[in-house]
Amino acid sequence: MADIKTKDGEMNTYIFHPERNGPHPIVIFYMDAPGVREELCNMCRRIASAGYYVMLPNMFYRRTRAFDFEPRRAHDPAYAGRLQEMWLNVRSLSPDLVAEDTRAMLALASEDPAAGKGKIGVVGHCMSGRYAFAMAGRFPDRVGAAARFYGARYIAPEEKDSPHLAAKQIKGEMYFGFAQFDEYASDAMIEELRVFLKENNVKAEIEMYPQAHHGFAFPGRAAHHVASAERHWERLFDMWRRNL
């Protein structure tokens, strides 16, 4: 783990990569709202084992060095305080802040001989899907592939730094994977995104995952759907092979 210095403090970031045959293309894995946990570390290890230099930052470092929420207890009254804390953490973030953090991660990686110097991949699930989208536009010369799964609020006109505002700068390939059943991603929202991407000539694919629910890719979730999770991995690795 590395403590990456930013203007707001130290961002504790887990780094995974193969021991041999570097340098390896960089993939930034932006966490979801429950925070950095072993489940995400294992997903990053899977990516690293395929030949990538993976960075998993604690995006809530401005508020806490460690936050781990158990999604299965989200409706437990005894867990209400923890749930409230999670939403406070989520609301503390913005595309501008995540861009600052991404810049700091890339600066650190530039000094690591194990990290590649070319195009990078970014991936976000749920909360961080919008940040993966935003970073593709903020760092168009670095992000070769950006993927998001069951995210929301990609187009938020009321926000001065909404993810969609930098879409015209995107040069890399985009992928959006949505669950068939997801209260956070309505059909209308997905269609609005589809039209927006086409109108702005963004190279993107939007795919629906039948029978899947929000959170399907996470093995520790009740919503885990094996077939959809494996398809999600197939799409990620295929896109990275083409672009990184």
What name fits each language-model region?
Residues 1-244:
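N-terminal cap/leader regions of alpha/beta-hydrolase-fold enzymes
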